[in-house]
């Protein structure tokens, strides 16, 4: 079964800064550029944008995600285009459901936002094959992302298809639509030098640009991470954690930051990466300081300001919203003004923008362990380490990247509340029918060699059976040895499961050694190879094999002598019987057993089914799959994705400290701000409300591949549990329990000075009864509240003028 198109929502919305026009409206819009900005209808503008990948959420979620993005100060939404989702089989297209790309762009337009169409069609995106269809490999002479007719023909056909769909729907700016930029290829410059064919790579990237421009879309084309050999008819852009020191390859084009990574992707064996709101704001403020801000920057990736469920991730969302607001307030001077840099000391710089009689200033402290005082026009400003202050009038600090005023929200998982429903789920079960695969008969075809899995299965299933037989005289014991390029392998001898193994930590070449008893006569060996997604990045990634390609496969006796089966007659069959029967759709004709309430546990290749009532309310619904091992989950026939809660995240030093100061990095030494070490890599899976039926049973089906215990599975809701905020005397504190009419139920802490612990478990310092009274009166029973911090609410004898408040929702 394939899970690459699983509908579990992953919203990647975050910060992005660009120079554009006002909200997209009726009538054609011209989009050009110069060395300072994009120019829309002759006017320079700054626009804030972010990324939402339409296949990673449901169409019903799109309006709310886009609305929250806009409320966070964004003016544009960008997305990749997912080729293998739209064309899973050659010339068989999919533009429905969460692949209805035109509907997605219309939702953006309806919200009054701009859009950026990143066709690629190679996208990376932590997506199978980087979005390229596996069937491309079946075409003779095919070489991915090099100058060759087979690849370029297919790429042009798909690119033209997408462009024409957008033209037919009047989605480009010149047609009155929201799309103001389009992208061709993606991060090709990162791998060009590793392809061992510089001429072909150069010819290919120039062909891409020429092909794109022939589409006549009426908006500029961009290329990400193309720092050398840049075609003259595209704008090259920057991706990364920091882009303030990056510049385009030539004059006359604007400096564009297409991906500002707000975190990092999650792997099965890795903890969660968190990039602090302070560091993201620091990077963006430096980017504006360096060249004035008429540019595009896209925040992309995980730990984003909207989480995978579409909830606000605070304080990141609020802190960046505050930054967006300040940048907008000095928009005109940034895009038209002249600027001067002044170095005050090592790693401390002041940049002053001037336009007519107005000015705006940035003060930058790049020291990662030292606060500094900077005197500007007679006023001294304290600047924390690793921060930027923005002074819209060069006098008053309106924003400092290290000082967060936005609230922190702690989301909690709550047991679902459904009246009259038993607490535990009642499961029935069915064993996967392995019998047809336990002999080497009835395969799709035979070969006297061990084939590569992706080519053989065309990526239509995670599973491929390799089956052979051997005639043996008498009984004997052997060790079955299999060398495989993974990602996972199960071995059966004469119908009995004798061993299982998977690749450790992404090192896909591994061995399986299992005891094997042969009887007199014909013996059958069945090997089930499983993939867990396909490589999406790097040079020639399509040539990375999967499965038992080449082997060897041997039977080794007690004396070390081997019988090499690698060139035996192997029968091949992709998929499992349950896939062909579509058990996950719960069709009539499937016989489920409840065994009088006793459910088998820790049995590999078992299907489980239960029903549940949708949790009341509108909060996010998740299913907790703790207790299971490895498999796939569906709700009402909708794929939630692969699960593997038995795979725990490694212990890493970064799990034990988090300091926003200093360079953030996701790879190599120096990782920090990690959580979840030693815990399941993922145990909670989003169940979009649109998947659920209210007032009637909902069906969940699990395919447990490795053997687990479903008795611990439960459905829960996710909502704000605690909210916290800090502010100095003279400022205000705003608290909110978020959406769905959640109200503030208690004020837990009102403390001046440093509160100990973390939000949700703060221990107060110097408690203020006056502050407690003020927040109780203003906030209890309210969805949100704002309180001015005055001297009247300071605690008696409290030395600090910073108040920390914690409330329960």
Swiss-Prot record:
Signal peptide: 1-23
InterPro entries cross-referenced by the UniProt entry: BetaGal_gal-bd (IPR048913), Galactose-bd-like_sf (IPR008979), GHD (IPR041392), Gly_Hdrlase_35_cat (IPR031330), Glyco_hydro_35_CS (IPR019801), Glycoside_Hdrlase_35 (IPR001944), Glycoside_hydrolase_SF (IPR017853), Lectin_gal-bd_dom (IPR000922)
Pfam families the record matches: BetaGal_gal-bd (PF21467), GHD (PF17834), Glyco_hydro_35 (PF01301), SUEL_Lectin (PF02140)
Enzyme class, broadest EC rank: hydrolase
Active site residues according to the UniProt entry: 187, 259
Localization (cell): Secreted, Extracellular space, Apoplast
Domain spans labelled SUEL-type lectin: 727-809
E.C. number: 3.2.1.23
SUPFAM superfamilies according to UniProt: (Trans)glycosidases, Galactose-binding domain-like
Protein keywords: Apoplast, Glycoprotein, Glycosidase, Hydrolase, Secreted, Signal
Main localization (coarse): secreted
Family designation: Belongs to the glycosyl hydrolase 35 family.
Name by which UniProt lists this protein: Putative beta-galactosidase 10
Organism: Oryza sativa subsp. japonica
């Amino acid at each position: 079964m394939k899970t690459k198109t699983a509908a579990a929502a992953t919203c990647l919305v975050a910060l992005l800064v660009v120079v554009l026009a006002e909200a997209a409206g009726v009538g054609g819009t011209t989009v050009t550029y110069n060395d300072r900005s994009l120019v829309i209808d002759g006017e320079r503008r700054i626009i804030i944008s972010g990324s939402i990948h339409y296949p990673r959420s449901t169409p019903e979620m799109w309006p709310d995600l886009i609305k929250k993005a806009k409320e966070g100060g964004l003016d544009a939404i960008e997305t990749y285009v997912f080729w293998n989702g739209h064309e899973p089989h050659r010339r068989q297209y999919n533009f429905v459901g969460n692949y209805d790309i035109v509907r997605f762009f219309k939702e953006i337009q309806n919200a009054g936002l701009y859009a950026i169409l990143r066709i690629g069609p190679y996208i990376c995106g932590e997506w199978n094959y980087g979005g390229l269809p596996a069937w491309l490999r079946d075409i003779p002479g095919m070489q991915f992302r090099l100058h060759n007719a087979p690849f370029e023909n297919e790429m042009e056909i798909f690119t033209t298809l997408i462009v024409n769909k957008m033209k037919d729907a009047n989605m480009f700016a010149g047609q009155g639509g929201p799309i103001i930029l389009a992208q061709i290829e993606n991060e090709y410059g990162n791998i060009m030098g590793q392809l061992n064919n510089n001429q072909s790579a150069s010819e290919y990237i120039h062909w891409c640009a020429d092909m794109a421009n022939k589409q006549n879309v009426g908006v500029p084309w961009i290329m990400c991470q193309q720092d050398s050999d840049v075609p003259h008819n595209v704008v090259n852009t920057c991706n990364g954690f920091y882009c303030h020191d990056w510049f385009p390859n030539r004059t006359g084009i604007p400096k564009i930051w297409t991906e500002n990574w707000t975190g990092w992707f999650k792997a099965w064996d890795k903890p969660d990466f968190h990039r602090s709101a302070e560091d993201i704001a620091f990077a963006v403020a430096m980017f504006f300081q360096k060249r004035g801000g008429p540019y595009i920057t896209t925040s992309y990736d995980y730990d984003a300001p909207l989480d995978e469920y579409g909830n606000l991730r605070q304080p990141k969302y609020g802190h960046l919203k505050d930054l967006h607001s300040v940048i907008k307030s000095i928009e005109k001077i940034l895009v038209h003004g002249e600027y001067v840099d002044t170095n005050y000391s090592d790693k401390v710089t002041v940049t002053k923008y001037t336009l007519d009689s107005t000015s705006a200033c940035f003060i930058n402290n790049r020291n990662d362990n030292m606060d500094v005082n900077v005197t500007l026009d007679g006023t001294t400003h304290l600047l924390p380490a690793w921060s930027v202050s923005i002074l819209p009038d060069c006098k008053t600090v309106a924003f400092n990247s290290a000082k967060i005023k936005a609230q922190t929200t702690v989301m909690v998982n709550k047991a679902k509340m459904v009246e009259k429903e038993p607490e535990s789920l009642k499961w029935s079960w069915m064993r996967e029918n392995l019998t047809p695969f336990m002999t080497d008969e009835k395969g799709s075809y035979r070969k006297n060699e061990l084939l590569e899995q992706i080519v053989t299965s065309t990526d239509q299933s995670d599973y491929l059976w390799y089956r052979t037989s051997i005639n043996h005289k008498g009984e004997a014991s052997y060790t079955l040895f299999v060398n495989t390029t993974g990602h996972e392998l199960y071995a059966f001898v004469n119908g009995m499961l004798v061993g299982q193994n998977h690749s450790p930590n992404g090192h896909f070449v591994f061995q399986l050694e299992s005891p094997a008893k042969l009887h007199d006569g014909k013996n059958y060996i069945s090997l089930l190879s499983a993939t867990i997604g396909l490589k999406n990045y790097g040079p020639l990634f399509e040539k990375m094999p999967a499965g038992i390609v080449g082997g060897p496969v041997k039977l080794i006796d007690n004396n070390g002598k081997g019988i090499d089966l690698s060139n035996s007659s192997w029968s091949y069959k992709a998929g499992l019987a349950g896939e062909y029967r579509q058990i996950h759709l719960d069709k009539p004709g499937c016989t489920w057993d409840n065994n009088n309430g006793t459910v088998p546990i820790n049995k590999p290749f078992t299907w489980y089914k239960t029903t549940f009532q949708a949790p009341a309310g509108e909060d996010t619904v998740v299913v907790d799959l703790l207790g299971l091992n490895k498999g796939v989950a569906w709700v009402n026939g909708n794929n939630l994705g692969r699960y593997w809660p038995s795979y725990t995240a490694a212990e890493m030093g970064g799990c034990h400290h988090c300091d926003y100061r200093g360079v953030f990095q996701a790879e190599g030494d120096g990782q920090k701000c990690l959580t979840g070490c030693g815990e399941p890599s993922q145990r909670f899976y989003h169940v979009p409300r649109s998947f659920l039926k209210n007032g009637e049973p909902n069906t969940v089906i699990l395919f447990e591949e490795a053997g687990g215990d479903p008795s611990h599975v439960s459905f829960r809701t996710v909502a704000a549990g605690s909210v916290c905020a800090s502010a100095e005397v003279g400022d205000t504190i705003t608290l909110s329990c978020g959406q769905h009419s959640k109200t503030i139920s208690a004020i837990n802490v009102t403390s001046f000075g440093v509160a100990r612990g973390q939000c949700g478990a703060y221990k107060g310092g110097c408690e203020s009864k006056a502050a407690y009274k003020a927040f109780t009166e203003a906030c209890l029973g309210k969805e949100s509240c704002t309180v001015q911090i005055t001297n009247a609410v300071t605690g008696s004898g409290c030395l600090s003028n910073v108040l920390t408040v914690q409330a329960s929702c």
